[in-house]
Each structure stands twice: as structure tokens, then as C-alpha cells.
Swiss-Prot record:
Keyword Hydrolase: yes
Name the UniProt record assigns to this protein: Putative bifunctional exonuclease/endonuclease protein Rv2191
Segments forming domain GIY-YIG: 248-326
Classification via SUPFAM superfamilies: GIY-YIG endonuclease, Ribonuclease H-like
InterPro entries: DnaQ, Exonuclease_RNaseT/DNA_pol3, GIY-YIG_endonuc, GIY-YIG_endonuc_sf, GIY-YIG_UvrC_Cho, RNaseH-like_sf, RNaseH_sf, UvrABC_protein_C
Region described as Disordered: 603-645
Low complexity bias: start-end ranges: 635-645
PANTHER family noted in UniProt: UVRABC SYSTEM PROTEIN C (PTHR30562:SF1), UVRC/OXIDOREDUCTASE (PTHR30562)
Taxonomic lineage from the root: Bacteria, Bacillati, Actinomycetota, Actinomycetes, Mycobacteriales
GO MF term set: DNA binding; DNA-directed DNA polymerase activity; endonuclease activity; exonuclease activity
E.C. designation(s): 3.1.-.-
Keyword Protein biosynthesis (UniProt): no
Length: 645
């Protein structure tokens, strides 16, 4: 079922069931429905609207909740009944969800809560086959709600129309299998509207159209339909034996080709279970099917915990660059903004700096160039590229003001220009963030002067710069520590602790203290066997960007505690005047930018004349969203503080 589009915005904390986890969807035990023809099978097509895409939360963020349930019971093409109700999520609905679904917090204020609605829905569904479009989303939310309400999950049969569509339709016929796209393809009578009952009705029509297609291929019972879904070739089934020797442990797996070459590298919390999915049709990616056909063996490395598995995967991807992996194969393809080594330094965008006075990393060169131009304006560094000797003076060779103003002072010596260099170095190193405060103030002033377009562009550039500065400062603080030992509880089921020895931002050793075993002797043992790490002059001491970022995220997870640091270190700390105080401002600015982009992609015609409530807080005041008056002139791309804005 089509879930709210916020799942694409986010949230790395989002969780939904894989198709292998759906209750009895594939490979389930025999039920009476298996022997029934599809015409005799009763389906309950369900759709949910929610406050977001996460079924689980943490100490800081609660899980998202269901706001509406809509369902249609059908059999033999006839509608037997419908179920529809709003659900009180017991917290406010985010503005982007309100804009998407039209369901407001006020609308659900008097609605029943999920603990009252769920038993009624299960009674309505009975022992029918549950159908959903993107079933992992909808069934995942229903199961999570049942668990939180202490309601027994009825273990229904589950059918996903999105997966069925991808199995039945070619990509030429259906490039997208989103519900709206399939509704257009089949010209269904009920159009999806991001309201639960409307979407459920549309899914009923899509289901019937897909069943018509499979009927021509000899699929007439629900059991035959389940067997039809996996789309597994006999050659794939024959290779299941490759996974039989793998342990049920976390680790890294490597698919190898006929000549021993590494085809693909991946990680798993359970090696045997994850690798088996490549042979039962759970993984639907075309390139994975091709890779499995080429594979002749599978190697694996057991790991103490998921952090070690993630780090080992990144290192193996860097070493082998497997052809069937798409990410992390080229760990040095990052862009950095660095101070040049010359008499009149400037900010330059380069791939491989030889020192650590850098801003970044950036995936995009254009973002790095925008940040370099903005920081030059903030600190008074020059943007002209003329090579100046120590005895020269800056200014005569700069372009005229009307063309492209150089932010550095004119007619100054190298000694006088050094003040700007010190300001830039202090900003990069986290010793002085006054320039960021001034830039934020300029955004406010532009908004107060009703120059909203200029303010929005400056806001977006500044948000990118703050995020890059703060990200780099945190990673450099971790890379500067000679040694840090951290522990994370292994969860209530396993017990014990996951242990990591981190040296200069790199994982030097990993281990686990099982439940009932004193952890400190284990810490001492893995510390003695830890790898020696020698930092280099490169950014982050030579650590892989993705590795140190992965470790930093792990350290920030709930429950992680620092066991100890090296004797000569004060601990893991950010610079006193880092970009951190402005990180929340940058996050708000980024949300405003995303909201503006969504509006520009088709919501302008629906805008009310007054400011939209979801955009009133762009700059902390109502009315800043005013769209009256002549358009503002565009800011030059490399001069965010120029006379245009």
C-alpha cells in the first residue's frame, strides 16, 4: 500500500519488514485458502496513513503512528464490506504529512486510539488474505501496533500488489509500480488520493487487473499465485547449497566468481539468513540475479558485532571494488575545501589535501565551490586566482566590483592579509564561529527587507556550509584521539556488551563481552591485540571518510558509553566555538528548503493567499513566506554575499 512519501526523506531511522519477514507471505504453512481458486479466495485490501515511516523509535524520537485505516473486503470481484476510520496517533501530525494526506491533528483529536481500532480491524479481516501495496510498510505498522498494544498478531496470509506488479509487468510497460502509476496504467475507477479508503479501493482494482494477467499464465489458485511470485530459476535454486555452511552470526559475505574474483560484498546480522535470500527470490534486483548466476563460491568473515561488520565491508569494498556493488567502492572520491599554501592563501576545491585545514568532505564539487565562496565572503579571503608573491600587494589584479567582487581587502600586504587567513583557519578549526553568526544575521535582515528569494538562497548556501563545518569538526575530533574504547549494550535478548577500540578514528579492534562475563578483562584483552594506527597528514588522519563517519554514528547511538581514552587525551569533545551551535538552525533551514522544493514541484496552484502553516517558521516569524512584489534578482553562484543579495 502506498505509504507516506516521508519514507524517502528519511529517515535513516526508518524500519519496515522485508518480504521474507511478512507473516506467511511466502513459504508459509498450508491453509485452506491455498486450495481455493482465486475467484473463491476472500481478500481484505488494506491501506494505512501514518505520521511517518518509522515503526520503531528511540529515547529521543517516538515511533510514527497510524492516523487512518481503510480496508475493502472482496471475493470473486464483489465487494463484501468496507472498513474505514481515523486513528488518534496521540501526538501531532507533521506539516509535510498534513500537506500529503490532508489529515490534520484536529481531525484525529476525537478519533479512537489504535488499541481500540485494531481488534475491530482484525475481526473485520477474519482469516482472509491481507493485501497491501508495499505490504512491508502497512503490515509492518500493523504488527508494530499490535505488539505495542499487547494484541496477539493473527498471522494472516499476506499478498503485496507492488511485488506482484513487478513480477507480472515488464519495466517497459510499467517503469514504476507505485500505486498512482498502476492506477493510470489500468485506468481504474478509484483514483488514489493518499487517503486510506480511496487508496484501498484503487488497490482492489489493481489487484483484479493483475489477477487477470496471471490467469493467462496458468495461475488459478492462491497457492499457485504464491509459487509464481518468487520468480526463481532452477539454476538459482541449485545454488542454495552455497549458503548452507554459513553461520547464524553477524559478519561480511563475499560472492566470488569462477576465477575467485570478488563479485559482491555485503554485511548481515545473520549471515546464513541474509545470503539465503539471494536464492529464494527475496532480492528482486536484476543485477543481483545476474551476480548469483555467476557466483561459484561464497566467503565470509564472522564479526563481533554490526559495527565491525560495517567497517570490514567498507574496507573490502575499497580493496576489491566489486563490480556488482554500487556504493563505497571509491573511498577517495571526495571533495574538500582547503586553504592553499602560498603567500596570499585562498580557499580551493581539491580531491586530496595534504593537510588537515580543510572543510568537508563533499560529494558534490558544486556544493564545495558554493561553500568556498561563502566562507571567503565570511572571512575576507580572496577569490581571485592570481599567483601573488610575498612582496606583492593584493588588489590591483582583482576584477572590478561590477564584474565579480573579490571579498579580500584591496592594496594590502601579505602580513595584513594574514588576519583574514587566521579568521578562516579559526572558523575551520572551530575556534571562532562569529562569521557564522554574522551570516545568519544577514539572512534575517534580508527576510526583514522582504527579499525572500535572496534570503532563501543565502539560507541554503549557509546551511550547506554549517553542515560541512560541523561534520568535519566532529570527525576531526574523533580522528585526533590516539585511543578511545567504547561499549554498547547488546540488547535485552542477548545481553552483554559490544566493545570497540578506536584509534585515530579507525576501528583497531572489536569484541564482545557475553552476558554474565565481567567486561573489563575482555576490554583489556582486545586492547592488547588491537591494531596500531599511525595517522597521516591527510584529512582525518588518513581514515576512510565513511569508516570514521560510521564509527561516529555508532558512538552517538543510545546506550553507548565511553570506557576509556588514552592517557594524554582529554576525551571526545567538540571545539568550543565550533559550528555546532548553528547545527539546529541549519537543520531547520534544510527542512524549509525541502518544503520549498516540494511546493515548486506542483503545489503552487494550491497555495492559499496567506502563508502556508508549514512554512511559517522558515526564519522564525510568520509572514516571511510572502509571495507578493516583484521577483528578487538572482544571487551570483560564487558570490553569495555580493550586491545582489
Amino acid at each position: 500500500m502506498q505509504g507516506p512519501n516521508v519514507a524517502a526523506m528519511g529517515a535513516t531511522g526508518g524500519t519496515q519488514l522485508s518480504f521474507a519477514d511478512l507473516a506467511h507471505a511466502q513459504g508459509a504453512a498450508w491453509t485452506p485458502a491455498d486450495e481455493m481458486s482465486l475467484r473463491e479466495t476472500t481478500f481484505v485490501v488494506v491501506d494505512l496513513e501514518t505520521t511517518g515511516g518509522r515503526t520503531t523509535g528511540n529515547d529521543a524520537t517516538p515511533p510514527d503512528a497510524i492516523t487512518e485505516i481503510g480496508a475493502v473486503k472482496v471475493c470473486g470481484g464483489a465487494v463484501l464490506g468496507e472498513f474505514a476510520t481515523l486513528v488518534n496517533p496521540q501526538h501531532s501530525i507533521p506539516p509535510q504529512i498534513v500537506r500529503l494526506t490532508g489529515i490534520t491533528t484536529a481531525m484525529v483529536g476525537n478519533a479512537p486510539t489504535i488499541d481500540a481500532v485494531l481488534p475491530m480491524f482484525f475481526e473485520f479481516a477474519g482469516d482472509s488474505v491481507l493485501v497491501a501495496h508495499n505490504a512491508g510498510f502497512d503490515i509492518g505498522f500493523l504488527r508494530a501496533a499490535a505488539r505495542r498494544c499487547d494484541i496477539t498478531w493473527p498471522q494472516p496470509q499476506v499478498l503485496c500488489t507492488m511485488r506482484l506488479a513487478r513480477r507480472v509487468l515488464s519495466r517497459d510497460e510499467a517503469p514504476s509500480v507505485r500505486l498512482a502509476a498502476l492506477a493510470r496504467l489500468f485506468a481504474v475507477a478509484s483514483n488514489p488520493t493518499h487517503r486510506a479508503l480511496d487508496d484501498a479501493r484503487a488497490t482492489v482494482d489493481v489487484l483484479h487487473a493483475l489477477i487477470e494477467r496471471v490467469g493467462n499464465q496458468g495461475v488459478h489458485t492462491y497457492a499457485e499465485l504464491r509459487s509464481y511470485l518468487p520468480n526463481v530459476t532452477q539454476a538459482q535454486r541449485c545454488k542454495r547449497v552455497l549458503a548452507e555452511t554459513l553461520p547464524h552470526r553477524p559478519g561480511v559475505y563475499l560472492f566470488r566468481g569462477p576465477s575467485g574474483e570478488v563479485l559482491y560484498v555485503g554485511t548481515a546480522a545473520d549471515l546464513r539468513r541474509r545470503v539465503s535470500q539471494y536464492f529464494n527470490g527475496t532480492d528482486r534486483r536484476k543485477r543481483m540475479t545476474e551476480m548469483v548466476m555467476l557466483a561459484s563460491s561464497i566467503d565470509h568473515v564472522e564479526c563481533a558485532h554490526p559495527l565491525e561488520a560495517g567497517v570490514r565491508e567498507l574496507r573490502m569494498l575499497s580493496t576489491h571494488a566489486p563490480p556488482y556493488n554500487r556504493r563505497s567502492k571509491f573511498p577517495y572520491r571526495w571533495w574538500w575545501v582547503a586553504l592553499t599554501d602560498e603567500a596570499f592563501p585562498r580557499l580551493s576545491v581539491i580531491r586530496a589535501p595534504r593537510h588537515d585545514r580543510v572543510v568537508g568532505p563533499f560529494r558534490s564539487r558544486s556544493k564545495a565551490a558554493e561553500t568556498a565562496a561563502l566562507l571567503a565572503r565570511c572571512t575576507g579571503l580572496r577569490t581571485c586566482t592570481t599567483r601573488l608573491t610575498r612582496s606583492a600587494r593584493h588588489g590591483p589584479a582583482c576584477p572590478e566590483l561590477e564584474v565579480s567582487a573579490c571579498p579580500a581587502a584591496r592594496d594590502v600586504t601579505a602580513a595584513q592579509y594574514a588576519e583574514a587567513v587566521l579568521r578562516a583557519a579559526a572558523l575551520i578549526g572551530g575556534l571562532d564561529n562569529a562569521a557564522l553568526a554574522a551570516a545568519v544575521q544577514q539572512v534575517t535582515e534580508l527576510a526583514e527587507r522582504r527579499r525572500y528569494e535572496s534570503a532563501a538562497r543565502l539560507r541554503d548556501h549557509l546551511a550547506t556550509a554549517i553542515e560541512a563545518l560541523w561534520h568535519g569538526q566532529r570527525l576531526r575530533a574523533l580522528a585526533a584521539l590516539p585511543e578511545l574504547i567504547a561499549a554498547k549494550p547488546d540488547g535485552p535478548r542477548e545481553g552483554g556488551y559490544q566493545l570497540a577500540v578506536i584509534r585515530h578514528g579507525q576501528l583497531a579492534a572489536a569484541g564482545r563481552a557475553p552476558r554474565g562475563v565481567p567486561p573489563m578483562p575482555v576490554v583489556d584483552a582486545i586492547r592488547r591485540g588491537a591494531q596500531a594506527i599511525l595517522p597521516t597528514p591527510a584529512p582525518l588522519g588518513g581514515a576512510l571518510v565513511e569508516e570514521i563517519a560510521l564509527i561516529a554514528r555508532w558512538l552517538a547511538e543510545p546506550g553507548v558509553r565511553i570506557v576509556g581514552v588514552s592517557n594524554d587525551a582529554a576525551g571526545l569533545a567538540s571545539p568550543v566555538r565550533s559550528a555546532g551551535p548553528w547545527a539546529a538552525w541549519a537543520a531547520t533551514a534544510r527542512s524549509a528548503q525541502l518544503a520549498g522544493e516540494q511546493l515548486s514541484r506542483g503545489w503552487q496552484s494550491d497555495l492559499p493567499t496567506e502563508p502556508h502553516p508549514s512554512r511559517e517558521q522558515l526564519f522564525g516569524r510568520t509572514g516571511v513566506d510572502c509571495r507578493t512584489g516583484p521577483p528578487q534578482p538572482l544571487l551570483p553562484g560564487r558570490q553569495p554575499f555580493s550586491t545582489a543579495g
